[in-house]
Amino acid sequence: MKPLSSPLQQYWQTVVERLPELLAEESLSAQAKSVLTFSDFVQDSVIAHPEWLTELESQPPQADEWQHYSVWLQEALSNVSDEAGLMRELRLFRRRIMVRIAWAQTLALVTEESILQQLSYLAETLIVAARDWLYDACCREWGTPCNAQGEAQPLLILGMGKLGGGELNFSSDIDLIFAWPEHGCTQGGRRELDNAQFFTRMGQRLIKVLDQPTQDGFVYRVDMRLRPFGESGPLVLSFAALEDYYQEQGRDWERYAMVKARIMGDSEGVYANELRAMLRPFVFRRYIDFSVIQSLRNMKGMIAREVRRRGLTDNIKLGAGGIREIEFIVQVFQLIRGGREPLLQSRSLLPTLSAIAALHLLSENDAEQLRVAYLFLRRLENLLQSINDEQTQTLPSDELNRARLAWAMDFADWPQLTGALTAHMTNVRRVFNELIGDDESETQEESLSEQWRELWQDALQEDDTTPVLAHLSEDDRKQVLTMIADFRKELDKRTIGPRGRQVLDHLMPHLLSDVCAREDAAVTLSRITALLVGIVTRTTYLELLSEFPAALKHLISLCAASPMIASQLARYPLLLDELLDPNTLYQPTATDAYRDELRQYLLRVPEDDEEQQLEALRQFKQAQLLRIAAADIAGTLPVMKVSDHLTWLAEAMIDAVVQQAWGQMVARYGKPNHLNEREGRGFAVVGYGKLGGWELGYSSDLDLIFLHDCPMDAMTDGEREIDGRQFYLRLAQRIMHLFSTRTSSGILYEVDARLRPSGAAGMLVTSAEAFADYQKNEAWTWEHQALVRARVVYGDPQLTAHFDAVRREIMTLPREGKTLQTEVREMREKMRAHLGNKHRNRFDIKADEGGITDIEFITQYLVLRYAHEKPKLTRWSDNVRILELLAQNDIMEEQEAMALTRAYTTLRDELHHLALQELPGHVSEDCFTAERDLVRASWQKWLVEE
């Protein structure tokens, strides 16, 4: 059992002051202290009934004790002689068992599924016992209700909602519907009543027995509004009246509610089977029924409006991604396909969710994420309610209850709990939107002209004329018509169901009206149809674009601006979800928040599911790349900020990959034993090149080297003991594998580790001492140049400090100016001969004379040349800040440094935009002449003339 957090330990002293002498602190177990600190409801209950605590300590709650509820309750009711006694015993029994459930739940003695089962069965036991006692009492008073054949007629109770599904909350009201089988009259009583009168009176007394507050509290708040005609309808209906109502007037929301309906008590009797058979055709249609989506969407819209109207913030049931949305997701499939798939006719959510996955209606990943989210949310909800036995789904705002929930949910503090909660609810919302979406787009009347429908549906030939394309050139008009015709032919080759074609027929006129209004219609349409070809068999994505006009507009504008984005969306259509929220689409994650967002994103994936972990990493990266590119296109991110975001994203990925690899290696071999007396992992990842210099582009690979500080004699401490240095080698190999494994979402990054000591011939991971020795005694000048742009991107503080010291020492070595100048210049000339532009009359922005690499070589040369005299030059690893340092330390004139900085950022900006256009990094020879002349002059000054 986890110790109480500091705030709860302080609160325990307040609890001690409330406890009677009979419950002295020294007599209480650690478990009792924890539960009493967590729940005021349990506190109040055991103060009033100390024997309950004794019972809990001697007979702790068990997962299967719900099987004994009925026997225990019958014993409690055995001496009850009147209604007041019945009410008292029901309330005391309910409170005693709820204390036991709260105890088990708080200490996590049983699973959440078991808690839900116990809560539901307790309610059913109390309802049925009350009904049976009252039925006997009413029969003694008014006679037994019978049908025309003289057969006794029972009261059947339908438990609705979570009660029916076996998923009741800790503090829940109960939704009931009362019914009796056949008309008739009472027999054997002092006066005759017809059955409707008998069951109405009995129903009223049953509600009073359960619902009316007394000095002992109440059993359950009873809600009868789900019955036919609601509050204006009869309290109890005959089977015939129920059947007439649901056949003639039953509404979609009532179908939705009836999915979970369960007969309380004897569910296998003749009348129970008759009622169940009567209701099934109303709930589960024989045909696949897609109409329910709009009905559920309307219901969700009503709930969303109520949430806004009542200001229900932080509501884990009704809020976006909350419990209600998971229920909606599951019941969409039940209502659409339940009539054809018996597996989907379960009342309980979790078995139905498993059936949905087994039938491949949702991906296993989505289904598992929903399952985990549901159990997380239900545990949080039940814990929240068990604090005061209060019906609430709103997260607390006070520090005490936040500390209670964080502790009980096994989190260090409230921010960690809310971080995990956000991750779960975000994932639920994603699946919900894919299936159901919002109701707003459907409330707007269709306004497209018939001409756009004709353009899509009539398959016009390229020589046909249509007024909607009149603004395009002849060539563009023919291209557009040809592309539409080709796209339709491609669709004929695909397996697209009726729903998919229906959605396409709704989507395409909208899409064409937006695309063809553009001057670049032909280019944009070619990019979007390539994307659509990839998703036409996945109706969910088509529906997303069809039902969210804003998402469609973002798609069109982004694809028009960048073929790179169009290609990315075509390869990974999951990214289409990102189009739903322009607030996040055009505003990338804060640079210092990538690690935290990624951590939250990965919480939705089981830690031991390596395949899904790899997918999640790649999907997160792609979504973030899309946001960065969208902001770049929109002009909200300058080039320096684009690279900052790409670099922070890469660092977050490196951190997550190392964490995964480390966990896998430690699970297999244990930790190297030299770590036992220190913090950290004795491991560092050093970024070189663009990563080290904060200058990553959209398709940049990562130049990495791996360092460790493991002694020669270290071994791992696991069952499969291996040499400590071998452990770090396997760790580095595992990291490379996690980066390069190709999944359905591609690879994470290309990683180049050849900058390590001795290059490809050297060990993949190097000891810190060997790295320092190599740099001092064997490294070439070009390797010292590379060190200028190197920095630790992952590593414990000791190893980071060691690397920084080695880097500073190497860079501040005294060097003979002429020799250094010659070596740097010759290396640049070799590179230019090997990598320079092979295209005549073109300028390679990076590799040609006057380009980016020349600027990088100038800064590297000057750092190596003057750092011995000016050690501050070693501070930064990026070119822009190095140029600032050169000016600040009087090595380079400020005007020259600023001019080189402008040239450098201008050229890099062009490279970014060429990447967005999927174009190579060369331009016309007459481009950037001023920048190139400036760089050439600086090169001549520093690397030729001195």
Swiss-Prot record:
This protein's record includes keyword Nucleotidyltransferase: yes
Molecular function (Gene Ontology), one example: [glutamine synthetase]-adenylyl-L-tyrosine phosphorylase activity
Cofactor annotation: Mg(2+)
Enzyme class, first EC level, given as a word: transferase
Record's catalysed reaction(s): [glutamine synthetase]-O(4)-(5'-adenylyl)-L-tyrosine + phosphate = [glutamine synthetase]-L-tyrosine + ADP; [glutamine synthetase]-L-tyrosine + ATP = [glutamine synthetase]-O(4)-(5'-adenylyl)-L-tyrosine + diphosphate
Disulfide bond entries: none
Protein name: Bifunctional glutamine synthetase adenylyltransferase/adenylyl-removing enzyme
Origin species: Shigella flexneri
The encoding gene: glnE
